[in-house]
């Protein structure tokens, strides 16, 4: 047999065995037989000097990386809203029905909420070309070499177009127990073990952990159409992705609640950590209608299992100063394991919280964790507090010794100009990737600039010179020049990035983008009053007050003036909606286009003033149909044939380009 054909046959055979073993849990050959075939494949690869892309030998882990590279996701990875009671789930369904203007029964899909590390897998031309962490939902870190060591994740699929598969990297509880039998340093819990392995620069370390994974959604896809979430899951199964056996369809929220009770009763039998249930609307067209809030999809929610509680000793309380000057008490605890995670820190919200819970240093406290990384102290065990020490209310800032001020239940340091934690946090936020994106700027750098160079405001960043930086510890010629170049490049920035960089309370990335798109100009945003702001979608009264109050602050006004004087040029490309036939129209794109990716054509249409939708109705104005257009094109044709009054037009790619 030809050596290449023999390699192809071995790869196919070994991948089939791995799929049966790691995904279906149905081993069909002995380890000895598998190893023998694997050794034959290695021998052939060495002889031919050729390695097939989906060869299992690619999973062993390559050389250690120097650092993780950033990766921008095609589709946003959203967070989920949360519910803790059946009443909150009922209220969620009521909000959905109100949005849909319908009281019809809704079909939901119920799945486990796994407690591991979120993965976003990119496939092109049938190959796994990228794997990344969630990051901030827009940009994550590439961990493809680490993910390749997960045997359950296919390196190749029978689908050639681009797609992003969302899932969770995990370590089974039984695998952790087996690993710890021979480990020099035993791992404390499966969640940290999985996250630590996937974020280890050395893929060989990842491989030793023998991680698993479950895939649960397709965030982005080209050249295919789905009508339901179940169809997505069937596609994943067909292409041999690891999918949880627990996926239930429920008619109405009452059935969902029944399922949750069943799962809670049996969750201790699971071999993977779960901290809740995810409930999703099954119909994708309904999802399009429901849309998204500023943070969450309206069509999905996470139900968090009843919190677990343990007791431990409160060893100390440290007051920390944040970017806004607010002092927050952080509890240091005797390490304890709760819900599969070892914790040594916990939340105490403010001084009133400390008094209400009657906690003291040295006493035993009740600790609750409900899916959150940082648990909460619920109260003290009174009989352990006799010899404990009262927590002192700060009278001065722990960082700069300024006299503190009270605003409601919170304590603030008013020294915003020279209090180190405040200034360092503001500068780090300003330079962050979602803001001014000054590459190579870290919290350590900000601290050095504050302490060694006396940096007292953000605008002073733009006055730094090579001679200033080269004298700093760990700053060589290249690092100094690169940082100065990055600072200079940040002068030309997008308006929404600049707005976010300013650190307006309650204003995140999306709200900053909404402000930029609506007003189109920094000065107009600064002058906007409460009534102008509160009418914007997703900007309520609290956010509007925050924005108005921020831009009325004399220190803020002065700070912005200094930045503009340094040459900062926030720019925003206003959409010219008067010159395009698509201005104000609803457009649906379906199928694969030759000259445009899905994200690219959506951006182009929005710049033309169009509203891009994912569902067809008689109110749709244009359907742009590419190759392999599916149910959406069929639906558009049915509307036209029905004789209903509509402005709907179907365009192929050439007709679309002719109208631009």
Swiss-Prot record:
Sorted alphabetically, which Pfam families does this protein's record hold? BRCT (PF00533), DNA_ligase_aden (PF01653), DNA_ligase_OB (PF03120), HHH_2 (PF12826), HHH_5 (PF14520), Nlig-Ia (PF22745)
* Reactions performed catalytically: NAD(+) + (deoxyribonucleotide)n-3'-hydroxyl + 5'-phospho-(deoxyribonucleotide)m = (deoxyribonucleotide)n+m + AMP + beta-nicotinamide D-nucleotide
Q: Name one GO cellular component term.
A: cytosol
The entry's active site is 113 (n6-amp-lysine intermediate)
| Chain residues that bind Zn(2+) | 397, 400, 413, 419
Q: What is its EC number?
A: 6.5.1.2
Source organism superkingdom: Bacteria
In this chain, NAD(+) is annotated as bound at 31-35, 79-80, 111, 134, 168, 280, 304
Enzyme class name: ligase
Query: Per its Swiss-Prot or TrEMBL entry, what cofactor is needed?
Result: Mg(2+); Mn(2+)
Choose any GO biological process term that the UniProt entry carries and state it: DNA replication
Q: Which InterPro entries match?
A: BRCT_dom, BRCT_dom_sf, DisA/LigA_HHH, DNA_ligase, DNAligase_adenylation, DNAligase_N, Hlx-hairpin-Hlx_DNA-bd_motif, NA-bd_OB-fold
**Gene3D superfamilies in the cross-refs:** 5' to 3' exonuclease, C-terminal subdomain (1.10.150.20), BRCT domain (3.40.50.10190), DNA ligase/mRNA capping enzyme (3.30.470.30), Helix hairpin bin (1.10.287.610), Nucleic acid-binding proteins (2.40.50.140)
Q: Which UniProt keywords apply?
A: DNA damage, DNA repair, DNA replication, Ligase, Magnesium, Manganese, Metal-binding, NAD, Zinc
In its UniProt record, a GO molecular function of this protein is: metal ion binding
Task: Establish whether keyword Ion transport is in the entry.
Answer: no
User: What is the role of the protein in this entry?
Assistant: DNA ligase that catalyzes the formation of phosphodiester linkages between 5'-phosphoryl and 3'-hydroxyl groups in double-stranded DNA using NAD as a coenzyme and as the energy source for the reaction. It is essential for DNA replication and repair of damaged DNA.
Q: Which family does it belong to?
A: Belongs to the NAD-dependent DNA ligase family. LigA subfamily.
The molecule here is called DNA ligase
Q: Which organism is it from?
A: Alkaliphilus metalliredigens (strain QYMF)
């Amino acid at each position: 047999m030809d050596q290449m054909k023999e390699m192809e046959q071995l790869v196919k055979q070994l991948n089939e065995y791995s799929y049966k073993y790691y995904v279906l849990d149905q081993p069909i050959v002995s380890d000895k037989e598998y190893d023998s075939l694997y050794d034959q494949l290695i021998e052939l690869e060495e002889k031919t000097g050729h390695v097939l892309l989906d060869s299992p030998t690619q999973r062993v882990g390559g050389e250690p990386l120097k650092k993780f590279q950033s990766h921008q996701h095609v589709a946003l990875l959203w967070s989920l809203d949360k519910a803790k009671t059946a009443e909150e789930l009922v209220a969620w369904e009521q909000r959905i029905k109100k949005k849909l203007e319908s009281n019809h029964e809704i079909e939901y899909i119920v799945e486990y909420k796994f407690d591991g590390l979120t993965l976003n897998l990119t496939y092109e031309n049938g190959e796994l070309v990228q794997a990344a962490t969630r990051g901030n939902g827009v940009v994550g870190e590439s961990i493809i070499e680490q993910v390749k060591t997960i045997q359950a994740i296919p390196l190749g699929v029978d689908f050639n177009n681009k797609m992003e598969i969302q899932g969770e990297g995990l370590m089974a509880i039984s695998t952790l127990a087996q690993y710890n039998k021979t480990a020099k340093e035993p791992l404390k819990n499966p969640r940290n073990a999985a996250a630590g392995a996937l974020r280890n620069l050395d893929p060989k370390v990842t491989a030793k952990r023998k991680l698993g994974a479950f895939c649960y959604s397709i965030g982005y896809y080209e050249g295919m159409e789905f009508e339901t979430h179940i169809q997505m899951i069937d596609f994943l199964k067909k292409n041999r992705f690891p999918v949880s056996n627990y996926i239930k369809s429920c008619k109405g929220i009452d059935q969902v609640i029944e399922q949750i009770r069943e799962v809670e009763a049996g969750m201790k039998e699971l071999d993977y950590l779960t901290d809740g249930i995810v409930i999703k609307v099954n119909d994708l067209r309904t999802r399009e209608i429901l849309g998204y809030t500023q943070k969450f999809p309206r069509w999905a929610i996470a139900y968090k299992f009843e919190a677990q509680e343990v007791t431990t000793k409160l060893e100390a309380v440290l007051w920390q100063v944040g970017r806004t000057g607010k002092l927050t008490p952080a509890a240091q605890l005797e390490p304890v394991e709760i819900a599969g995670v070892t914790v040594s820190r916990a939340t105490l919200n403010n001084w009133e919280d400390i008094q209400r819970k009657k906690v003291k240093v040295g006493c035993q406290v009740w600790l609750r964790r409900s899916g959150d990384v940082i648990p909460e102290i619920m109260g003290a065990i009174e009989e352990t507090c006799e010899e404990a020490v009262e927590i002192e209310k700060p009278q001065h800032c722990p960082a700069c010794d300024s006299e503190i001020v009270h605003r409601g239940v919170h304590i603030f340091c008013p020294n915003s100009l020279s209090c180190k934690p405040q200034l360092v946090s503001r500068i780090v936020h300003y330079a962050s990737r979602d803001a001014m994106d000054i590459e190579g700027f870290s919290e350590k750098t900000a601290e050095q600039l504050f302490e060694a160079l006396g940096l007292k405001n953000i605008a002073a960043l733009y006055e730094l010179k090579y001679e200033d930086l080269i004298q700093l510890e760990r700053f060589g010629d290249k690092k100094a020049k690169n940082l100065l170049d990055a600072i200079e490049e940040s002068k030309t920035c997008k308006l929404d990035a600049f707005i976010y960089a300013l650190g307006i309370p309650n204003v995140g990335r999306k709200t900053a983008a909404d402000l930029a798109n609506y007003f189109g100009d920094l000065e107009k945003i600064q002058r906007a009053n409460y009534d102008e702001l509160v009418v914007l979608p997703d900007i309520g009264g609290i956010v509007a007050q925050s924005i108005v109050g921020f831009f009325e602050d004399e220190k803020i006004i002065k700070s912005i003036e200094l930045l503009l004087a340094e040459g900062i040029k926030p720019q925003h490309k206003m959409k010219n909606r008067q010159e395009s036939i698509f201005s104000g129209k609803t457009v649906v794109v379906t199928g694969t286009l030759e000259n445009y990716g899905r994200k690219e054509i959506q951006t182009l249409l929005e710049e033309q003033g169009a509203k891009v939708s994912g569902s067809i109705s008689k109110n749709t104005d244009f359907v742009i149909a590419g190759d392999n257009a599916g149910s959406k094109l069929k639906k558009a044709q049915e509307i036209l044939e029905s004789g209903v009054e509509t402005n709907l037009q179907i365009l192929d790619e050439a007709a679309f380009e002719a109208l631009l």
